[in-house]
């Protein structure tokens, strides 16, 4: 029992050491990217957008930074997702229905909104009516995903052309910008002394009473006590009868509250799994939201005390969940269990992710791993090699010299201690003499590797 507790404490210590070095955002990086420059860029872009288009100025309600720097972001914060909410006049009169063809999506009928706007004498509201009717809805008054996307794309392009795709947000430092669209996002890439990207994602604001949630999810929504949710204009493939007018339901504010209301071990585990995903080249198809979704399900399935377990226990359990979901080829959308979020991936893509993840729970539990190996396991799985090299301030030559010394010293000591000049495991040795034969034992070389791994100098 005591040995088990000591191992548990050792594992926790190594995880938190790794977290501090490779998972947490360094304070200077958070200020550099998540602070003044990022805020100044967003203020500048939307100042121009509002000025160039009075209609957009009326309907933009607020901004929210998803996966905020202090909560779920990891390491160097150079990618951001910012949701800007579009609140149309009389938005509570939008007729919201579940998309019968696409789980997790809704249809937005603007008929009643247009009627109310038509009877409203205010000039700015008349311009909004003309915008909706002329550019954003189809003949049946349903909001069209691609029309909203095209309208916003033209506005972003105009705004960036206005400043020649460059800004000086810090005195004497010019940043160059590039713009593209991908899915629902309007992405701006920043180059120069400050390098990062921002996905600006539009979201149509809807009232709490307009939700179309199943019973269990509705309970979560009510518990969070939020007054709104959003519909995201996410283009869909393949095309269906409704895909052009189908918007993805989004409950980011509710998700944020659910994650904040449990112990920080939950959020730390999410960040570790995201770091693991970033380190592994064959997990490119594992989106951050898939990981977040697994934790949302866990929150409603387990008592609050679950999150008081050691971080190593939670991580192993959540990697088990991820592996099992990938094995079955299903990650269920939290807000509509009928939607399999990885359904669009091929079987080979899903299986590749499964093979990468399936061994991790066993290794995290560390039952058959020496402490030295476990130390390196944590480094290897939750940090990039380049990060480790920088942290160790260790040159390639120094690595080779240290490894060479470890091999010579460890083999000599091990052989002399074990064999004393006798025939062992098919290898003849003499006292004080080291010779590596073709039948060198695995345990000998494992011992050498353990010593190097414990120093974090060799993989």
From Swiss-Prot:
Binding, ATP: 68, 79-81, 252-255, 274, 288-292
Cofactor list: Mg(2+); Mn(2+)
Residues annotated for Zn(2+) binding in this entry: 263
Swiss-Prot/TrEMBL keywords: Antiviral defense, ATP-binding, GTP-binding, Immunity, Innate immunity, Magnesium, Manganese, Metal-binding, Nucleotide-binding, Nucleotidyltransferase, RNA-binding, Transferase, Zinc
One GO BP annotation of this record: innate immune response
Pfam families: Mab-21, Mab-21_C
The protein's Enzyme Commission number: 2.7.7.-, 2.7.7.86
Activity regulation comment: The enzyme activity is specifically activated by some nucleic acid.
InterPro entries the UniProt entry points to: Mab-21-like_nuc_Trfase (IPR046903), Mab-21_HhH/H2TH-like (IPR046906), MAB21L/cGLR (IPR024810)
GO CC annotation: cytosol
Record GO terms (molecular function): 2',3'-cyclic GMP-AMP synthase activity; 3',2'-cyclic GMP-AMP synthase activity; ATP binding; double-stranded RNA binding; GTP binding; metal ion binding
Binding of GTP, residues: 199, 248-255
Known function: Nucleotidyltransferase that catalyzes the formation of cyclic GMP-AMP from ATP and GTP and plays a key role in antiviral innate immunity. Directly binds some unknown nucleic acid, activating the nucleotidyltransferase activity, leading to synthesis of both 3',2'-cGAMP and 2',3'-cGAMP second messengers. 3',2'-cGAMP and 2',3'-cGAMP bind to and activate Sting, thereby triggering the antiviral immune response via activation of the NF-kappa-B transcription factor Rel (Relish).
Name assigned to this protein: Cyclic GMP-AMP synthase-like receptor 2
Annotated source species: Drosophila melanogaster
